[in-house]
Amino acid sequence: MKLLVKLGGTLLDSAASRDSLCLQIAAARAAGHEVTVVHGGGKQMTRYLTDRGIESRFVGGLRVTSPDTIDAVLKVFAGSVNHELVANLNRAGALAVGLSGIDSFLVEAEQMDPELGAVGRVTGSNPALLHLLTANGYVPVVACVAGDRLGQIYNVNADQMAVACASAFGACRLIFLTDVDGVMDNSNRVRPVLTAAESRQLIDEGIATGGMQAKLNAALSALADGVQQVRIAPGAAPGALQRILAGEEIGTKMVTA
């Protein structure tokens, strides 16, 4: 099965959860699944900027990316976070390869809004490299950085990067492993299953807001692009990925209808 696993930056900030997730991804690859990983790193980015006296500014939940910040994006997302994750996956037994959307125009982007600086909107994807690597037993690990044909580099929302890669790669499942238990209803209970229509209703009624609204919108885009199933699940739950692949209902499963 072709899988796209998106790892939230908060999970990667903990050595214990990072090591556990890497073991699970390596096990999924060993079981015959073709796995591509996309990762965030917002928490690590904020810490990096704070240590250097650079303020983190957000507009509509998106990080304003100045020339100073885009340099940090490359160093943190495509540098330290990506390389540490690749090293951990290799130690776990996977053959991981670190990438970003810039590599072979894997994911192309354009400037979203001048007010946001170098924040990109995905405009296209070229999955040949993902197919080549996964077909030969490798696990691509993609940082949320993309570019255009003129060489401009953009910071791209990691959830949108995951959707772009999942859709282009032809993933059967897109699994968001995050720091929440799933999608909550208005009684603060996890919804085990959501259709696309029910997801839109949670957004329209203001129940899903902020980061969860962004994840639901990303999931809806993935479903519309042909991904069969999207899951939003707690990555820190013991054996979360293995249990999901075994059919256990963890977090929230999203389907078209």
Swiss-Prot record:
Annotated catalysed reactions: N-acetyl-L-glutamate + ATP = N-acetyl-L-glutamyl 5-phosphate + ADP
Site (Transition state stabilizer): 6, 215
Location within or outside the cell: Cytoplasm
Top-level taxon of the source organism: Bacteria
Amino acids binding substrate: 41-42, 63, 155
EC number(s) given by UniProt: 2.7.2.8
Gene Ontology molecular function: acetylglutamate kinase activity; ATP binding
Gene Ontology CC entries for this record: cytoplasm
Keyword annotations from UniProtKB, A to Z: Amino-acid biosynthesis, Arginine biosynthesis, ATP-binding, Cytoplasm, Kinase, Nucleotide-binding, Transferase
Pathway linked to the protein: Amino-acid biosynthesis; L-arginine biosynthesis; N(2)-acetyl-L-ornithine from L-glutamate: step 2/4
GO biological process: arginine biosynthetic process via ornithine; L-arginine biosynthetic process
Main enzyme class: transferase
Coiled coil spans: none
Family: Belongs to the acetylglutamate kinase family. ArgB subfamily.
Biological role: Catalyzes the ATP-dependent phosphorylation of N-acetyl-L-glutamate.
PANTHER family per the UniProt record, alphabetical: N-ACETYLGLUTAMATE SYNTHASE, N-ACETYLGLUTAMATE SYNTHASE, MITOCHONDRIAL
Entries under NCBIfam families matching the protein: argB
Name the record gives this protein: Acetylglutamate kinase
Originating organism: Solibacter usitatus (strain Ellin6076)
